[in-house]
Curated annotation (Swiss-Prot):
This is Septin-9. Septins polymerize into heterooligomeric protein complexes that form filaments, and associate with cellular membranes, actin filaments, and microtubules. GTPase activity is required for filament formation. Interacts with SEPTIN2, SEPTIN6, SEPTIN7, SEPTIN11 and SEPTIN14. Interacts with RTKN and ARHGEF18. The modification N-acetylmethionine is found at residue 1. Gene3D superfamilies: P-loop containing nucleotide triphosphate hydrolases (3.40.50.300). PANTHER family: SEPTIN. Keywords: Acetylation, Cell cycle, Cell division, Cytoplasm, Cytoskeleton, GTP-binding, Nucleotide-binding, Phosphoprotein. GO terms for cellular component: axoneme; cell division site; dendrite cytoplasm; microtubule; microtubule cytoskeleton; non-motile cilium; perinuclear region of cytoplasm; presynapse. Its main location: cytoplasm. The gene is Septin9. The lineage of its organism: Eukaryota, Metazoa, Chordata, Craniata, Vertebrata. Residues 342-345 are annotated as: G3 motif. The modification Phosphothreonine is found at residues 24, 31, 125. GO terms for molecular function: GTP binding; GTPase activity; molecular adaptor activity. Residues 38-165, 178-224 are annotated as: Disordered. It comes from Rattus norvegicus (Rat). It holds the Pfam family Septin.
Length: 564
């Protein structure tokens, strides 16, 4: 019985032919046959020389008929390992190659049958390997891969594994795939209930698994032969390893739904910074109320008329004169063309009847000049804006109420320009006098129908609360000064007296800071918009109606500049 099994075992090994001398592998170690154990094995191996001319296809068919079990998939790790003790039942995987094996009985060393290493099941748990493993099925025609054979002895040789570079590599272990038999045919042989001594089988069945180390391949390379490559990194636990690192030079992906409408703000800012801004402010009041000083304090520059004009040329005018001076102011890259319009002689005469008419005429003349520039056929690309945007009206700090001149002037000019009333030299009033004086002025404005800026009818929804607070402060009790002092280590603008220093920008001393915020920091653009959209628009409609009626009657009529 035992002899028959040995005979069957030898028949299963009659699968490879002798390889021609020119195709002898460069590294071949042969194992001597155990003639003492098996008596008839020498005769069987001598018969192999006769079968050298048989084709490789016939050998594959012979083995496929004798294969009692399907092929087994196994995973071998790179590196030579000492053989482990095998059980009585051993499963073998035979790698069929089209090359012939040169085998002679007289040559010492084991015969090369191209057998896979026997996989011993249930003895040792494989250790985790930090490298990525790719299972690849070797085709018989692929001869370009490097084959590294382990030595037949149990002690591994030092030169068994080739030394490779330090680049990260993945180990490809060749296993057969039963589902793809036409592409990668690897029929296995199984020995069951073998009672032969293990020492006899090790000489014949010592595995020589072809292990190939290849450099790391990217995703495109792994898709070349999808029928014979199974990438273990496709598992969810290795999905993160396959992701390529993001380059540092790559920009963050732009939102797909982003259009770029918000860039219009930057475009408008660049255009406005290039063109600059224009602001025209008029100061009206009697002489000696500190009009020029307040303007210098507002813009912290010597921009008033008196600051530029020599004192020797200063004289008391017999009539009201309108004088303007223009400055180019730049702060943090923002340029503004500031025009200050002064009205010397207003209210300084004995008879102040109709003293407001020159001021009204000047305001309407600026509207007319701007209108003529608009209606021209070949008008300028940018029309110079000389319209009066704001008028500061200085009220003397009498402590009583408004004078008839003040009421008449503000009543007429509030319809054509933005009027902001201020109490000049408010430091001459006590706190109680200031509160009482402001209440009297507010009641006089309401009783005479004088609508000062900010007008309630022009309020926008988001500015209503802010404008209400400003309206409660009107008229602003201000103090102007262009002298600097050191108070508690800080530089301030103020007025120094025997009893202390009045700080101009201190809201507990005066309301100059609120006036500056209204005119410059919060409402400057709104003041210009109301001038253009409300006051100038009313003047333009009136002039166009007058022009149409004059053309209908055939009469040329001079534009009225006295009053709207």
């Amino acid at each position: 019985m035992e002899r028959d099994r040995i005979t069957a075992l030898k028949r299963s090994f009659e699968v490879e032919e002798i390889e021609p001398p020119n195709s002898t592998p460069p590294r071949r170690v042969q194992t001597p046959l155990l003639r003492a154990t098996v008596a008839s094995s020498s005769q069987k191996f001598q018969d192999l020389g006769v079968k050298n001319s048989e084709p490789a296809a016939r050998l594959v068919d012979t083995l496929s008929q004798r294969s009692p079990k399907p092929s087994l998939r196994r995973v071998d790790l790179a590196g030579a390992k000492a053989p482990e003790p095998m059980s009585r039942r051993t499963e073998l995987s035979i790698d069929i190659s089209s090359k012939q094996v040169e085998s002679t009985a007289s040559t010492p060393g084991p015969s090369r049958f191209g057998l896979k290493r026997a996989e011993v099941l249930g003895h040792k748990t494989p250790e985790p390997v930090p490298r990525r493993t790719e299972i690849t099925i070797v085709k018989p025609q692929e001869s370009g891969l490097r084959r590294v054979e382990t030595p037949a002895s149990k002690a591994p040789e030092g030169s068994a594994m080739p030394v490779t570079d330090a680049a990260p590599k993945r180990v490809e272990i060749q296993v057969p795939k039963p589902a793809e038999a036409p592409n990668c045919p690897l029929p296995p042989q199984t020995l069951e209930n073998s009672e032969a001594p293990m020492s006899q089988l090790q000489s014949r069945l010592e595995p020589r698994p072809p292990v190939t180390e290849v450099p790391y391949r990217n995703q495109e390379d792994s898709e070349v032969a999808p029928s014979c490559v199974v990438d273990m990194a496709d598992n969810p636990r290795d999905a993160m390893l396959k992701q390529a690192p993001v380059s540092r030079n790559e920009k963050a992906p732009v939102d797909f739904g982003y259009v770029g409408i918000d860039s219009i703000l930057e475009q408008m800012r660049r255009k406005a910074m290039k063109q600059g801004f224009e602001f025209n402010i008029m100061v009206v009041g009697q002489s000696g109320l500190g009009k020029s000083t307040l303007i210098n304090t507002l813009f912290k520059s010597k921009i008033s008329r008196k600051s530029v004009q020599p004192i020797s040329e200063e004289r008391i005018p017999k009539t009201i004169e309108i004088k303007s001076i223009t400055h180019d102011i730049e702060e943090k890259g923002v340029r503004m063309k500031l025009t200050v319009i002064d009205t010397p002689g207003f209210g300084d005469h004995i008879n102040n009847e109709n003293c407001w008419q020159p001021i009204m005429k000047f305001i309407n003349d600026q509207y007319e000049k701007y209108l003529q520039e608009e209606v021209n056929i070949n008008r300028k690309k940018r029309i110079p804006d000389t319209r009066v945007h704001c008028c500061l009206y200085f009220i003397p700090a009498t402590g009583h109420s408004l004078r008839p001149l003040d009421i008449e002037f503000m009543k007429r000019l509030s319809k054509v320009v933005n009027i902001v009333p201020v109490i000049a030299k408010a430091d001459t009033l006590t706190l109680e006098e200031r509160v009482y004086f402001k209440q009297r002025i507010t009641s006089d404005l309401l009783s005479n129908g004088i609508d000062v800026y900010p007008q309630k009818e022009f309020d926008e929804a988001e500015d209503r609360l802010v404008n209400e607070k400003f309206r409660e402060m009107i008229p602003f009790a201000v103090v102007g000064s262009d002298h600097e002092y050191q108070v508690n280590g800080k530089r301030i603008l103020g007025r120094k007296t025997k009893w202390g220093t009045i700080e101009v920008e201190n809201t507990t001393h005066c309301e100059f800071a609120y006036l500056r915020d209204l005119l410059i920091r919060t409402h400057m653009q709104n003041i210009k918009d109301i001038t253009s959209n409300i006051h100038f628009e009313a003047y333009r409609v009136k002039r166009l109606n007058e022009g149409n009626s004059a053309m209908a009657n055939g009469i040329e009529k001079e534009p009225e500049t006295q009053e709207m």
